[in-house]
Swiss-Prot record:
Phosphoserine modifications at: 55, 57
Cytoplasmic side: 51-61, 119-142, 208-233, 299-342
MF terms (GO), sorted A to Z: G protein-coupled adenosine receptor activity; G protein-coupled ADP receptor activity; G protein-coupled purinergic nucleotide receptor activity; guanyl-nucleotide exchange factor activity
Taxonomic lineage: Eukaryota, Metazoa, Chordata, Craniata, Vertebrata
Disease linkage: Bleeding disorder, platelet-type, 8: A condition characterized by mild to moderate mucocutaneous bleeding, and excessive bleeding after surgery or trauma. The defect is due to severe impairment of platelet response to ADP resulting in defective platelet aggregation.
Function noted in UniProt: Receptor for ADP and ATP coupled to G-proteins that inhibit the adenylyl cyclase second messenger system. Not activated by UDP and UTP. Required for normal platelet aggregation and blood coagulation.
Listed GO CC annotations: cell body membrane; cell projection membrane; cell surface; membrane; plasma membrane
Domain text: The transmembrane domain is composed of seven transmembrane helices; most of these are not strictly perpendicular to the plane of the membrane, but are tilted and/or kinked. Agonist binding promotes a conformation change in the extracellular loops that leads to an inward movement of the transmembrane helices. Antagonists such as AZD1283 can bind to an overlapping site, but block the inward movement of the transmembrane helices.
Region (Disordered): 319-342
Family according to the record: Belongs to the G-protein coupled receptor 1 family.
Matching InterPro entries: GPCR_Rhodpsn, GPCR_Rhodpsn_7TM, P2Y12_rcpt
Protein name: P2Y purinoceptor 12
């Protein structure tokens, strides 16, 4: 989505405004390398477990889409690492601008969208804890998931196609140099749309968690003195979603506003431009951290995922049998895919 940012230099006095290569070519590639290995292991394990869990609720459907999105994002990290570390050739940098950078932002906003849907689902679970999903609701969740993927794909595809200019030299410093005139216009349009996507989901998270907090407080007042400590612990787990959302996505979208201004208007001096660049890259790394934090959501909020993971760690060959046990419980009327009612 924001391919222009990844390999960019600031406008204006670009040749005079240099950056610390130890940060741009060493530190950030090392940080992304850590994320790559941690994310590949945790999300690969999550994918294996989710293949064994039936989609018996909207919650599970949204989680499965999230893990797919996270894995796609993680697979773009090696290209960014090589490009940022200046270890790649000209064709690699062109490939990053044209493909992997676009996929990175494509998956970021898919993850944001599904976190918003998961938040709505958790609010419904809080207010109506014993409501079960019916086939019609499940079909609606699947259709909505397909619509999100299709919409983001249609937004992203032109960014790939319209990055079609031949580089003037081997070292492509700005992805915008490779975009056609309409490609630059489309890129700007997509940026605005993605901003809208974020702020809509930001409002969803704020509103839903305000209502969830009120509902949990009412529940606490009603049961005060009864001593239901285990239940209180379960209630707290739901707040992991808002924690992940604010840690990973909020800083980047606030930092992005002044950074974009520094890229489009010559209103900052060199020191300010570099500071904004480092802040943008740091917060962009936090958005990538989401791929490593999402498995905590799966573990704490999805009982069948947690049970399967614990069983797999204790005995790798028992995961399949546990999946069969889960399906048997579902046939008997239980739903092991949901957390204990809040």
């Amino acid at each position: 989505m924001q391919a222009v940012d990844n390999l960019t230099s600031a406008p204006g006095n670009t040749s005079l405004c240099t950056r610390d290569y130890k940060i741009t070519q060493v530190l950030f590639p090392l940080l992304y390398t850590v994320l790559f290995f941690v994310g590949l292991i945790t999300n690969g394990l999550a994918m294996r477990i989710f293949f064994q869990i039936r989609s018996k609720s909207n919650f599970i459907i949204f989680l499965k889409n999230t893990v797919i999105s996270d894995l796609l994002m993680i697979l773009t990290f090696p290209f960014k690492i090589l490009s940022d570390a200046k270890l790649g050739t000209g064709p690699l940098r062109t490939f990053v601008c044209q493909v992997t950078s676009v996929i990175f932002y494509f998956t970021m906003y898919i993850s944001i969208s599904f976190l918003g849907l998961i938040t709505i689902d958790r609010y419904q679970k809080t207010t109506r804890p014993f409501k079960t999903s019916n086939p019609k609701n499940l079909l609606g969740a699947k259709i909505l998931s397909v619509v999100i993927w299709a919409f983001m794909f249609l937004l992203s595809l032109p960014n790939m196609i319209l990055t079609n200019r031949q580089p003037r030299d081997k070292n492509v410093k700005k992805c915008s140099f490779l975009k056609s005139e309409f490609g630059l216009v489309w890129h700007e349009i997509v940026n605005y749309i993605c901003q809208v996507i974020f702020w809509i989901n930001f409002l969803i998270v704020i509103v839903c968690y305000t209502l969830i907090t009120k509902e949990l407080y009412r529940s606490y007042v009603r049961t005060r003195g009864v001593g239901k400590v285990p239940r209180k612990k379960v209630n707290v787990k739901v707040f992991i979603i808002i924690a992940v959302f604010f840690i990973c996505f909020v800083p980047f979208h606030f930092a992005r506003i002044p950074y974009t201004l520094s890229q489009t208007r010559d209103v900052f001096d060199c020191t300010a431009e570099n500071t904004l660049f480092y802040v943008k890259e740091s917060t962009l790394w936090l958005t990538s951290l989401n791929a490593c934090l999402d498995p905590f959501i799966y573990f704490f909020l999805c009982k069948s995922f947690r049970n399967s993971l614990i069983s797999m760690l204790k005995c790798p060959n028992s995961a399949t049998s546990l999946s069969q046990d889960n399906r048997k419980k579902e046939q008997d009327g239980g739903d092991p895919n949901e957390e204990t009612p809040m």
